[in-house]
Amino acid sequence: MTTILENLPAGQKVGIAFSGGLDTSAALHWMRIKGAVPYAYTANLGQPDEDDYDAIPKRAIQYGAEGARLIDCRAQLVAEGIAALQCGAFHISTAGVTYFNTTPIGRAVTGTMLVAAMKEDGVNIWGDGSTYKGNDIERFYRYGLLVNPDLKIYKPWLDQQFIDELGGRAEMSEFMRQAGFEYKMSAEKAYSTDSNLLGATHEAKDLESLESGIKIVNPIMGVAFWRDDVKIDKEAVTVRFEEGRPVALNGVEYKDAVELLLEANRIGGRHGLGMSDQIENRIIEAKSRGIYEAPGLALLYIAYERLVTGIHNEDTIEQYRENGRRLGRLLYQGRWFDPQAIMLRETAQRWVARAVTGEVTVELRRGNDYSILATRSPNLTYQPERLSMEKVQSTFSPRDRIGQLTMRNLDITDTRDKLRIYSEVGLLTPGESSALPKLKEDESGN
């Protein structure tokens, strides 16, 4: 049975998801001097705040890693991000502004690809920097075990000895300095940031207070659109989809989806598009707050949704949205590769996305302020001549509509009878200022 190790497994190989930051650097060196055999695995997720990926494995070796590998996860990350977009797998929103589940998508890719690399090296113990209060500890647990059923989990941040010796950033910085690495602790920010090519998450510290707003955040994928001194010119951009896949921006075709998303990030980022402030429910049902960036996905999603609504009928769109919200929750919970998620993904990608071919032109302004300027698709079922108020060849006549309205008498009569019954049993009372009935107040006045 898979176990979570509470103490360092001395003498054994331990894989650590290594970012090169202070926490994982100190943890790796600490594990080495305590007798474990650490292996470092770094995921290249196209993080916008990382300048030199090649240097990270080299630092891991300096800190005591027996081996260090850089795993390029960008293509898989973008593939999963586009799959989520095709399915509308986004369940968190506030007043219509969407969080694009960029961190959960990143965890699905990291959790599977890094553990697969560890398995190749005969490393069956995995550690990472997730804490016991967050979502990632469960996401990584699930994805890791899917790839390697023999996996055991060791997290330094769940090891009391590690916590006692290196429980804070100041202690970690001093530990590294005394070890001769001259590791300088970076300036403390008012919040923490986690990012990948799809988007960035800002949370914790000052952002835990709902009295602190988006204005304390320094965007890393776009501009602070709320600042008066930030000049932003409006810009028209055209996005083209073929069978549900984004293939071109402003007439430029991209064979590499990673390059397309990078350009979409640049375009959307110039306007601060895709930033949102969300209160959400973590997997353990406690509420948390995050401020998110996803300029490229936001741009693609605007165009994709426009085409979906112009191509598919109402019932299909309703099912797409309901399934998307459900799939978004599964993704958030670390269940992106579970059977129920695969079933929902297959439905949307096959029967919704494959019909989405066309292009949409959007005018971007500041933040999430935009207008759709044009929509073109050979698959549109929107045909204005069907409902034109002008004198045109119509698909139905006035007499046809009279017949259709007459048929409505059946359900109108049924509704009237039901309202009478509700009134007779005391559920409804006639409104004093309206011909419509209203709910009868209970004894408490509600």
Curated annotation (Swiss-Prot):
This is Argininosuccinate synthase. L-aspartate binds at residues 131, 135-136. It is an enzyme of class 6 (ligase). Keywords: Amino-acid biosynthesis, Arginine biosynthesis, ATP-binding, Cytoplasm, Ligase, Nucleotide-binding. It is found in: Cytoplasm. GO terms for molecular function: argininosuccinate synthase activity; ATP binding; protein homodimerization activity. Homotetramer. One of its GO terms (biological process) is L-arginine biosynthetic process. ATP binds at residues 17-25, 43, 129, 131, 136, 194. The keyword Isomerase does not apply. Pfam families: Arginosuc_syn_C, Arginosuc_synth. Its EC number is 6.3.4.5. It catalyses: L-citrulline + L-aspartate + ATP = 2-(N(omega)-L-arginino)succinate + AMP + diphosphate + H(+). The keyword Ligase applies. Pathway: Amino-acid biosynthesis; L-arginine biosynthesis; L-arginine from L-ornithine and carbamoyl phosphate: step 2/3. It comes from Burkholderia thailandensis (strain ATCC 700388 / DSM 13276 / CCUG 48851 / CIP 106301 / E264). L-citrulline binds at residues 99, 135, 139, 192, 201, 203, 280. GO terms for cellular component: cytoplasm. Belongs to the argininosuccinate synthase family. Type 2 subfamily. NCBIfam families: argG, PRK05370.1.
